[in-house]
From Swiss-Prot:
Entry coiled-coil feature ranges: 151-230
InterPro entries: Vesicle_transport_protein_Use1
Presence of the UniProt keyword Membrane in the record: yes
Protein name per UniProt: Vesicle transport protein USE1
Transmembrane segments: 231-251
GO biological process: protein transport; retrograde vesicle-mediated transport, Golgi to endoplasmic reticulum
Keyword Membrane: yes
Length: 258
């Protein structure tokens, strides 16, 4: 089947979107989002077209459109950690969009996006580490310059903070134990359900065996009943025949008196 004009335009726009997604864009860049919106509309029209491509091709097109939409949504997330997590769930296309591609462009975009998120997370961790060190050093200097009463208040505050920290650790341990207990209960429930299923399967098998035995016994009784009826009919036939012959002989042996 020849490629329709709508599919050709869709592939061109898809290739353009993948090219824009692979570039480093400013936060005010709006073209990719508009292009992806138009791409989604064209894909809906392509699915309804009489000369639509094969189901496998449509599935790959849909996968690439969903990947671009998910990529845009991931870039709007506030923190690098959230962006990285969202990127992990993205599924790029499996085939090249145009014939000149050796590797699918969406896979390349996915790798670049994950690398950018990792770099942003690294920068954030380094900056937070430097700022925390500076804050700690300033706090120590400030405490050394405080009077005795204020130092004592700071020590009490540290104790309160340590107490809250211990409570948080205890709460985390309790939640971990609760999760473990929940997991153990789930596994136990699964084992019970599995055993019940096995028992039910065995009961069904036993019921099938009993049904077959009952069927065999019913057939045997039916055959026995048929034999009994046949014997009774033969017996009646013999009795009737004997009676008839006896009457004939009696008439012949003792003729009627005149």
């Amino acid at each position: 089947m020849a490629t329709s004009r709508l599919e050709i335009n869709f592939v061109r726009l898809l290739s353009r979107c993948e090219s824009l997604a692979s570039e480093k864009r400013a936060e005010t860049e709006w073209r990719l989002e508009k292009y992806v919106g138009a791409l989604e509309e064209m894909f809906v029209a392509l699915k309804k077209s009489p000369s639509k491509p094969t189901p496998e091709t449509l599935t790959d097109y849909n996968r690439k459109v969903d990947f671009l939409k998910g990529l845009l949504e991931a870039e709007k997330l506030p923190s690098p950690a959230e962006k990285s997590l969202a990127n992990q769930f993205l599924a790029p296309g499996r085939t090249p969009t145009i014939s000149s591609e050796r590797t699918p462009a969406s896979k390349t975009v996915h790798i670049q996006s994950k690398a950018r998120c990792a770099g942003e997370m690294r920068k954030e961790l380094m900056s937070s580490g430097v700022s925390n060190s500076a804050l700690l050093e300033n706090d120590l200097r400030h405490r050394k310059s405080l009077p005795v009463d204020e130092r004592q208040s700071a020590a009490e505050l540290d104790q309160i903070l340590q107490h809250h920290h211990n409570l948080q650790e205890k709460l985390a341990d309790d939640m971990l134990n609760l999760a473990r207990n929940l997991k153990n209960n789930t596994l136990a429930a699964q084992n019970i359900i599995k055993q019940d299923n096995q028992t039910l399967t065995q009961s069904m098998r036993q019921a099938d065996v009993n049904f077959e035995k009952l069927k065999t016994e019913s057939e045997r009784l039916e055959q026995h009943a048929k034999k009994s009826v046949n014997w009774f009919l033969w017996l009646m036939l013999i009795v009737v025949s004997f009676t008839f012959i006896s009457m004939i002989l009696f008439i012949r042996l003792f003729p009627r008196l005149r």
